[in-house]
A protein has these predicted regions:
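A structural-propensity feature for long, helix-poor, extended segments
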Residues: 56, 63-106
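Short alpha-helical linear motifs
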Residues: 45-52, 90-97, 116-119
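Secondary-structure transition/hinge residues
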Residues: 15, 105-109
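Short, mixed-charge aromatic SLiMs
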Residues: 25-39, 70-85, 119-129
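Cysteine-cluster motifs in flexible loop/terminal segments that predominantly coordinate metals
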Residues: 1, 111-138
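Conserved mixed alpha/beta catalytic, RNA-binding, or beta-rich assembly cores of soluble enzyme
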Residues: 3-15, 19-63, 67, 71
Length: 138
């Protein structure tokens, strides 16, 4: 699942930085079904970044700042994903979401996570690849 990939990458970064996470964290990413980008209007990768911020900030529906931080993260990731346009590419959207989250965590939590250099090698396998419009296309 796409959200599992984004979630997993971000949590791996936390582990490297010795940031403690609640045990049920990874289960949240599994709750986002495939295809939500087209059917719900919100990419699962973008949603996962908000879940990630929710967990590291201790957000709940009743908390002020953490709740806002989580929702702002989701909106930033979805804006970055949506700005490129479709059709969807789960790899591209995951990369964009991860980079958005890394930047957001640095900005809002003063935590520096390793930002990957990404060059896509999958365009030949994706009939809907947008090629030059994709920031990761080789």
């Amino acid at each position: 699942m796409l959200s599992d990939l984004v979630f997993g990458k971000l949590f791996l970064q936390c582990r490297k930085l010795n940031i403690r996470l609640i045990p049920q964290s990874l289960n949240r990413g599994k709750a986002v079904p495939g295809g939500v980008c087209g059917f719900w209007g919100a990419c699962g990768a973008g949603i996962s970044t908000g879940m990630f911020i929710s967990i590291i900030s201790g957000a709940t529906p009743l908390k002020n700042e953490p709740w806002g931080l989580a929702n702002k993260m989701t909106s930033k990731a979805l804006d970055a994903i949506g700005s490129i346009g479709g059709p969807r590419c789960c790899k591209r959207d995951s990369y964009i979401a991860i980079i958005s989250a890394i930047d957001y965590v640095a900005e809002n939590f003063n935590i520096q996570m390793e930002k990957p250099v990404i060059k896509c090698i999958h365009s030949d396998k994706n009939n809907q690849c947008i090629k030059e419009r994709c920031p990761f296309h080789e």
